[in-house]
């Protein structure tokens, strides 16, 4: 369900889809595993359990939730998801942050000297330097990121155990009606995690070179959407076949185009854009 170019690609595709129901990557993930994946002869999708499907649906508007049946009910009734889904939610967020630290350092967009002022990174940096003063910088960074992840996981497990005991949760229904998430970091670690997020937003995501890449991503996604909406016959056969039942339905066409673009990798999207716009490229 994640578009090429991450959040910038998602925002661009959502803008393109405004007249056709919009685009939410969590809904697209659910659509992929329920409908788009073709692995079985007797049914579409992957036949995943309810709990897995609910965990995929991290965010959802009330309008869309009403169309999803049981899996969307918690957004309407304002109940909590299962513990599995709560774990997945925080695991995804932590994985993104730590990956972006590693990626930002390797790309040179952020520097170790800056990150040392961020508590979550700085504490692990000091410990790694104390234990392994002579290791290469690239190995040191990997070790710091690994320790950051371990630090977060240990705190999450220990604090969540306390939350579950305090809530007296003994069943799925207890979890759903707890009134709050029962999986979470302790307040000090949560504050450290938020500090890292703020740093990444200010120093990495708004870096001028990242902003340039974001703009390129928006152009590629928007151009691809426009080309295929103007002439859906340029879609690959497996996508074009889905339009034969309603060839004049613009909304159906837009959804198929969005499915195609959302399934692309960054590299594939750039290559497809080049094939469609560069006269020297083979189509």
Predicted feature residues:
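Aspartate-rich (DDxxD/NDxxD/DxxxD) Mg2+/diphosphate-binding motifs
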Residues: 1-19, 26
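Generic structural signal for short, solvent-exposed loop/turn connectors between secondary structure elements
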Residues: 19-20, 70
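Histidine-centered, transition-metal-coordinating active-site segments
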Residues: 27, 32-41, 45-283
């Amino acid at each position: 369900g994640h578009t090429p170019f991450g959040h910038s690609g998602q925002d661009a595709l959502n803008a393109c889809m405004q007249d056709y129901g919009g685009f939410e990557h969590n809904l697209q993930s659910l659509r992929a595993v329920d409908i788009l994946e073709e692995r079985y002869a007797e049914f579409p999708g992957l036949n995943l359990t309810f709990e897995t499907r609910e965990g995929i649906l991290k965010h959802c508007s009330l309008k869309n939730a009403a169309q999803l049946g049981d899996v969307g009910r918690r957004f309407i009734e304002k109940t909590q998801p299962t513990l599995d889904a709560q774990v997945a939610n925080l695991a995804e967020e932590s994985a993104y942050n730590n990956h972006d630290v590693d990626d930002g350092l390797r790309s040179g967009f952020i520097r170790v000297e800056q990150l040392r002022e961020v508590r979550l990174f700085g504490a692990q940096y000091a410990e790694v330097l104390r234990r392994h003063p002579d290791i290469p910088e690239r190995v040191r960074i990997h070790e710091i990121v690994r320790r950051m992840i371990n630090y977060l996981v240990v705190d999450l497990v220990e604090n969540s155990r306390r939350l579950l005991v305090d809530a007296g949760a003994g069943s799925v229904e207890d979890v759903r009606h707890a009134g709050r998430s029962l999986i979470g970091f302790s307040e000090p670690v949560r504050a450290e995690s938020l500090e890292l997020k703020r740093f990444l937003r200010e120093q990495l995501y708004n870096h001028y070179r990242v902003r340039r890449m974001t703009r390129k991503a928006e152009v590629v996604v928007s151009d691809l959407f426009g080309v295929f909406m103007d002439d859906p016959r340029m879609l690959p056969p497996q996508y074009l076949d889905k339009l034969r039942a309603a060839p004049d339905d613009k909304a159906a066409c837009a959804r198929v185009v969005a499915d195609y673009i959302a399934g692309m990798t960054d590299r594939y999207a750039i290559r497809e854009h080049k094939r469609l716009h560069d006269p020297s490229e083979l189509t």
